[in-house]
C-alpha cells in the first residue's frame, strides 16, 4: 500500500483563491462589457485566460503535493479531495462560459435563426468537453481494469471475502477501501499482497527504501559469538559453530566465487527457538552434553550460521520475554490490517513449539506474519494435517498440525516430504588439518560398527548380528550401565568424542543399522568416512498406522527403511538396504561389502557450501507473502499421470524426479491439461488431497477447490492423479537444474 502525507485544503488558501478569482473575473467581465461594442473580443480568448489562471493555480498545488497519488482509493484527505473541489468550480465556470459564448454569438452574428452563413449546427465546445461532476465526485470515471491474476491463486477468493467483510474493521476504510471492487483490489495488492499490483499505481515508498539495504557476506563470527554468548542454552550450538568455523568461512568464500551473491536484499530475520524456552518444558539444552537428542540443535546451529554468513540481520530469541520485546510494536494490535511503516521482521524461523508461543504473543496481528514463517519440522507436516477443517473431518487428533500455512513453509531434516521444503543440516567433519593427513593413512580393519548408542535399540537383534559377526568384528558406542541386549562378542567403546568417532569409522568397513533411530545423521557421517551402511528394510513400511513412534505426528508418510534418504538418493555401493529377517540377503550384502573398495562420499547438500546455497535460494526465491511467485521456474515442470493406487510422490520418484507442489496450480484447469493431451469431457471442483485427478473411462476431471490441499501424498483408488514433477541437481535435491 502506498502511504502519503495527507494534504488538507485549508480554508485560508481556498478563500484567497476565491477572492482573487472573483476579483479578476469581475474586472474581466467589466472590460468585456465596455469593449464588446467597439471591438468584439473572442470568447475563446476569454476562455483561455480563465483556464490559464486555473492551470497556474493547479500547477502550484501539484508542485506542493508532488508525491501524492490521485484517485478515490489513495486514502482520506489526499489530492482527490482537491480534484472534487475543483471539479465543482470548473463545472460552474464552464457553464458561465457557455452562456457568455451564446450571448456573444448572438451579438456578433445575429440570432441563429437569421444567420446566413450557418448551414449546419456546430456543436458547442462546451458540450464536447463537458465534465460530469457527479462522476468525478463519486469516482465513477476512475476506470479499474484488473490485470491477469496468473500466479495469484488466492486473489479471487480474497476479493470475495472483502466484499462481505470490508466493514468488519474500520482500518480497511483508512486504507481507502470504499466498497468498490477497485478499492478491494488495490488494498489486496498493495497492503496484503494477495493480488497483482495495478500498473498505474505508484510503488510503496517503504518497499523501495527496503531495497536500498543489500546483504554482504560475512567472513568472521565475532558478532554472532557475541549474540549467542548471552544465552547459556546456546552453549552446545556455540561450540559446534566454533569447531566448524574454518569450514564455514571457506564454504561462503567458495560459494561467492561460484555464483553471484551481489545485489541481494538484506532481510530482517527473527529466529525463535521455542524448544529452548523454559515454558516449553523440554530439557534439550541441559541434556545436550549427556547423551540427549541433538538433531534439532544441529539443525538450528547450522541454520543460524548460514543466515549470518549470508549477510542478513538476525535476532535470536529463546524466551517469551525476548519474543515480546522484539515484537512489542505489534503486540496488542487488534486491527485487521497490517501495521504501517518499517517492518519489524521479514522472515521468521521457528519450530512447532515456538509457533504456538508466537501466535499467542501476537494475538490478532498473527495473521499478518503467517506468510513470513519458516517452521523447522523434522518429520514434516503433510497437507492433510496442515489444513485444520480437513484434518478435523478425517478425525486426525495430532497436536502438531492444523496451522493452515502453505505446506512448503515447513522445513524438514531430510527431503522426505516433497510438500514441505528441505532445510537439512551439515554433516560435521571433526578433524583438523593434521588429523586429515593422518586419517588418510589409516588402514581399514575387518570390522563393523553398530548404529545404536542405547541398549534397548539392540533388543531382538542377536540373530542378525550373529550373521555379521561370522564375517567380521562387531564394535559399539553404547553408553550407560545397561548392556543386557548386547552380545558378548561386541567390543563397546562407550561414548566417544566426535574426533575419536571419526578415527573409528575410518578403521571400519561396515556401519550396521538396527532399524532405529529413524533418519538420523550418523549414517551420512559413516558414509562420509568411507563406510558402507547396512540399511534395514521395513516390510510392511512403518507409519502411524502400525508404529507407535509415529502416532500423533502430522504425517501418514511410510518409511520403507531405517534411512529412506540413504536408500533413495545414495544407494549402492554406499548403502545396502536389506531385510534383517532374510539371512541370505544379509549374508550376500556383507560379502559384497567386504569385496568392494569404496571412497568416502558426502552429498553436496549436507556440506556447509551446499546448505549455504540452498538457504540462499530459499531466501531469494521462496515468497509466500506476494501471491504465488513463480519458483521453481515452469521450465522444470514435467507432468506424469499416476496409476490408480499410486501417489504423485511415487510416480515422480520412479522417473528419478521430485514432486513439486508449487506446480499444481498450473494443472488445475481444463485448458492447462490440454497442453499435456489430457482431454476432459466433464469436470468438477472438489476439496481433497487426491486432486487434480482424471478418470480415463469417462474422461472426467476433478480439480482442486482448496489451494492448501494440493498434495504430493495420497493415492486415489480409481482415478489417475495428475502429478507435477521436476528434475533436481544431483546432491542438491531441493533445487531444480534451472533454479539457480
Swiss-Prot record:
TM region positions: 14-30
Modification after translation: N-glycosylated. A secreted form is released from the membrane after cleavage by gamma-secretase.
UniProt entry keywords in alphabetical sequence: Disulfide bond, Glycoprotein, Glycosyltransferase, Golgi apparatus, Membrane, Secreted, Signal-anchor, Transferase, Transmembrane, Transmembrane helix
Topology class, membrane: Single-pass type II membrane protein
Tissue: Detected in kidney (at protein level). Detected in kidney.
Top-level division of the source organism's lineage: Eukaryota
Gene Ontology BP annotations: positive regulation of cell migration; positive regulation of receptor signaling pathway via STAT; protein N-linked glycosylation; protein N-linked glycosylation via asparagine
GO molecular function: acetylglucosaminyltransferase activity; alpha-1,6-mannosylglycoprotein 6-beta-N-acetylglucosaminyltransferase activity; glycosyltransferase activity; manganese ion binding; protein phosphatase inhibitor activity
Its biological purpose: Catalyzes the addition of N-acetylglucosamine (GlcNAc) in beta 1-6 linkage to the alpha-linked mannose of biantennary N-linked oligosaccharides. Catalyzes an important step in the biosynthesis of branched, complex-type N-glycans, such as those found on EGFR, TGFR (TGF-beta receptor) and CDH2. Via its role in the biosynthesis of complex N-glycans, plays an important role in the activation of cellular signaling pathways, reorganization of the actin cytoskeleton, cell-cell adhesion and cell migration.
Family assignment from sequence similarity: Belongs to the glycosyltransferase 18 family.
Protein name: Alpha-1,6-mannosylglycoprotein 6-beta-N-acetylglucosaminyltransferase A
Organism of derivation: Rattus norvegicus (Rat)
Gene field: Mgat5
Amino acid at each position: 500500500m502506498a502511504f502519503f502525507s495527507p494534504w488538507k485544503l485549508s480554508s485560508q488558501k481556498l478563500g484567497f483563491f476565491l477572492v482573487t478569482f472573483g476579483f479578476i473575473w469581475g474586472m474581466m467581465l467589466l472590460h468585456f462589457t465596455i469593449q464588446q461594442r467597439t471591438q468584439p473580443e473572442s470568447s475563446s480568448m476569454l476562455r483561455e485566460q480563465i483556464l490559464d489562471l486555473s492551470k497556474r493555480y493547479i500547477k502550484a498545488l501539484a508542485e506542493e503535493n508532488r508525491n501524492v497519488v490521485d484517485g478515490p482509493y489513495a486514502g482520506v484527505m489526499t489530492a482527490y479531495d482537491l480534484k472534487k473541489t475543483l471539479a465543482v468550480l470548473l463545472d460552474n465556470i464552464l457553464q458561465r462560459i457557455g452562456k457568455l459564448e451564446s450571448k456573444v454569438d448572438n451579438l456578433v452574428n445575429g440570432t441563429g435563426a437569421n444567420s446566413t452563413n450557418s448551414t449546419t449546427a456546430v456543436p458547442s465546445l462546451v458540450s464536447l468537453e463537458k465534465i460530469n461532476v457527479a462522476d468525478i465526485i463519486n469516482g465513477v470515471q476512475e476506470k479499474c481494469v484488473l490485470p491477469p491474476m496468473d500466479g495469484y491463486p488466492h486473489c479471487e477468493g480474497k476479493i470475495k471475502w472483502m466484499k462481505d467483510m470490508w466493514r468488519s474493521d474500520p482500518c480497511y476504510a483508512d486504507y481507502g477501501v470504499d466498497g468498490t471492487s477497485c478499492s478491494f483490489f488495490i488494498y489486496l495488492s498493495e497492503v496484503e499482497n494477495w493480488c497483482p499490483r495495478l500498473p498505474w499505481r505508484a510503488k510503496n515508498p517503504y518497499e523501495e527504501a527496503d531495497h536500498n539495504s543489500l546483504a554482504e557476506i560475512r567472513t568472521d563470527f565475532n558478532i554472532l559469538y557475541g549474540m549467542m554468548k548471552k544465552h547459556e542454552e546456546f552453549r552446545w550450538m556455540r561450540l559446534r559453530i566454533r569447531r566448524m568455523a574454518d569450514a564455514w568461512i571457506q564454504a561462503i568464500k567458495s560459494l561467492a566465487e561460484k555464483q553471484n551473491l551481489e545485489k541481494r536484499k538484506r532481510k530482517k530475520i527473527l529466529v525463535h527457538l521455542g524448544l529452548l524456552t523454559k515454558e516449553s518444558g523440554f530439557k534439550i539444552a541441559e541434556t545436550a552434553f549427556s547423551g540427549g537428542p541433538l538433531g534439532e540443535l544441529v539443525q538450528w546451529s547450522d541454520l543460524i550460521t548460514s543466515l549470518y554468513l549470508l549477510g542478513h540481520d538476525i535476532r535470536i530469541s529463546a524466551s517469551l520475554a525476548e519474543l515480546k520485546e522484539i515484537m512489542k510494536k505489534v503486540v496488542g494490535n487488534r486491527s485487521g490490517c497490517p501495521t504501517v511503516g518499517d517492518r519489524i521482521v521479514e522472515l521468521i524461523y521457528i519450530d512447532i513449539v515456538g509457533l504456538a508461543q508466537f501466535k499467542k504473543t501476537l494475538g490478532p496481528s498473527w495473521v499478518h506474519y503467517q506468510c513470513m514463517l519458516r517452521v523447522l519440522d523434522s518429520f514434516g507436516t503433510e497437507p492433510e494435517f496442515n489444513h485444520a477443517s480437513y484434518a478435523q473431518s478425517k478425525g486426525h487428533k495430532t497436536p502438531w498440525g492444523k496451522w493452515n500455512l502453505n505446506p512448503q513453509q515447513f522445513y524438514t531434516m531430510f527431503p522426505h516430504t516433497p510438500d514441505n521444503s528441505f532445510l537439512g543440516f551439515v554433516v560435521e567433519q571433526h578433524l583438523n588439518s593434521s588429523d586429515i593427513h593422518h586419517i588418510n593413512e589409516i588402514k581399514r580393519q575387518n570390522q563393523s560398527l553398530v548404529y545404536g548408542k542405547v541398549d534397548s535399540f539392540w533388543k531382538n537383534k542377536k540373530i542378525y548380528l550373529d550373521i555379521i559377526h561370522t564375517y567380521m568384528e562387531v564394535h559399539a558406542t553404547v553408553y550407560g550401565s545397561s548392556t543386557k541386549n548386547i552380545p558378548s562378542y561386541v567390543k563397546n567403546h562407550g561414548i566417544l568424542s566426535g574426533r575419536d568417532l571419526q578415527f573409528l569409522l575410518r578403521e571400519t568397513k561396515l556401519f550396521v543399522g538396527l532399524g532405529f533411530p529413524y533418519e538420523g545423521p550418523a549414517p551420512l557421517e559413516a558414509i562420509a568416512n568411507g563406510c558402507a551402511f547396512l540399511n534395514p528394510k521395513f516390510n510392511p513400511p512403518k507409519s502411524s498406522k502400525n508404529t507407535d513412534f509415529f502416532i500423533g505426528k502430522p504425517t501418514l508418510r511410510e518409511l520403507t527403511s531405517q534411512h529412506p534418504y540413504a536408500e533413495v538418493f545414495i544407494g549402492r555401493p554406499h548403502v545396502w538396504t536389506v531385510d534383517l529377517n532374510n539371512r541370505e540377503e544379509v549374508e550376500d550384502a556383507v560379502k559384497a561389502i567386504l569385496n568392494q573398495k569404496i571412497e568416502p562420499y558426502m552429498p553436496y547438500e549436507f556440506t556447509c557450501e551446499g546448505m549455504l546455497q540452498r538457504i540462499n535460494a530459499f531466501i531469494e526465491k521462496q515468497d509466500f507473502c506476494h501471491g504465488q511467485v513463480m519458483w521453481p521456474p515452469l521450465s522444470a515442470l514435467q507432468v506424469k499421470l499416476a496409476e490408480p493406487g499410486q501417489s504423485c510422490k511415487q510416480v515422480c520418484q520412479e522417473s528419478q524426479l521430485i514432486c513439486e507442489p508449487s506446480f499444481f496450480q498450473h494443472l488445475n484447469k481444463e485448458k492447462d491439461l490440454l497442453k499435456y493431451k489430457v482431454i476432459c469431457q466433464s469436470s468438477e471442483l472438489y476439496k481433497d488431497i487426491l486432486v487434480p485427478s482424471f478418470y480415463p473411462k469417462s474422461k472426467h476431471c476433478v480439480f482442486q477447490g482448496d489451494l492448501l490441499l494440493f498434495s504430493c501424498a495420497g493415492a486415489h483408488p480409481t482415478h489417475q492423479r495428475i502429478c507435477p514433477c521436476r528434475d533436481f541437481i544431483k546432491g542438491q535435491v531441493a533445487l531444480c537444474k534451472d533454479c539457480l
